[in-house]
Amino acid sequence: MTNPSEALSEKRDVVLLGASIGFYWKFEDLPKRMGMEGYTFEYIGEDGFDKSKTLQKILSRPNRPDAIFLKQCAAYFPGDLVQYQALMKTYVQECLKAGIVPILVTVAPVREPGIFKLQYWKNIVKKIIYPSRPTVEARLRDLTAYNDWLKKYSLEQNLEIVDLEKALRISDTDRRLRADFDGGDGLHLNSNAYAKLDQIVMPTLEKVDWNRFIRVRGQTSTID
């Protein structure tokens, strides 16, 4: 890891700040699985969309990571998209002030479980008992709206993004989770999905302009 006053070392330390995907992905083992020399990965989990306290703990370390993947879970949708956007902008600002590379991550898509899955029938019962409970359609609608904003924001601010949704969805026009990536409940992923996600991390890291973030270490960022 790098000290605030030092240039990045050859070995770069990357943290994934997220929830269930990071845990089951076994993110810390990804460099070994993919033969990625020069990287160490760490997963830090935090339930709930607001990860401010956990992020501050990471940023206050004596030796901070070189990059942080900012990942949110589909379970937090539908939600207050305006608040979610404001929080994500704050996370990016805090990372930049610390000279850490913020890497945005889209939310993985969801789907209705197959009719032969127990979760499918559980969802029907829940709709009857809790009619105000968010539907899968509502969850998908909000998370794709958030993803669209996140991709636009990454372009505006010249930030790299790992597009989990694109890797896992059926198509550009059908943004549901692919059936062969469904862990069984329409929300969580299976081993095939995680193997697919392994393949999109390194290309993202290779595009990072690490020197850009060294220059802002300890300075006030102008990114909105």
Where do the PLM segments sit?
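N-terminal secretory targeting modules
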Residues: 1-17, 21-36, 97, 113-116, ...
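Conserved SGNH/GDSL esterase-like catalytic core that processes O-acyl groups on lipids
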Residues: 2-86
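Catalytic His-Asp segment of secreted/periplasmic serine-dependent ester chemistry enzymes
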Residues: 17, 119-224
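Serine-dependent acyl-ester chemistry module
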Residues: 57-59, 67-82, 110-144
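A cross-family glycoside hydrolase active-site/sugar-binding cleft signature
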Residues: 71, 105-107, 165
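Generic structural signal for well-ordered alpha-helices
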Residues: 88-92, 147
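A short helix->loop->beta-strand "cap" motif at the edges of active sites that frequently abuts
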Residues: 97-102, 159
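Short beta-alpha junction loops
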Residues: 99-100, 106-112
